[in-house]
Amino acid sequence: GLGDVYKRQAIGAQMALGRDQRVVMFTGDGSFHMNLNEACTAVSYELPIITVIFNNQVLGMVRQWQTAFYGKRFSQTDPHRKTNFVKLAEGFGLKGYHCENLAQFQEAFADALKQKGPTWIECMIDKDEKVLPMIPGGGDINDIIMK
């Protein structure tokens, strides 16, 4: 739901912490596409950021809002792209992982911790998986949606 801010925050945190500690960043595939250029910075500086990409192959937060507030009238939420994040990582010279279940994620994460530079872990999720809690537009903490 934060679109274009995730990567630079992870880069800043990793620069502040140094290479002895690991930053783990969680993002969606849509957000990752919006900031692919920032991956170049992490690669150039060999920052050991572990990026976990929740891939539902749609713009999940937009779809979630359209489900909750617009009667599932979906508009512009399916970009019709099926990115292979493992091959994309390899194109950057990185280690990439593709996970379909928790056991695969646990194995990938354990291996990612051993890598020296950035790594990407793609986790496939259902296109209707929700990100909660959320506060509706114009609302406050009293309007929080928990389920």
Regions inferred by a protein language model and the residue ranges of each:
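Thiamine diphosphate
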Residues: 3-147
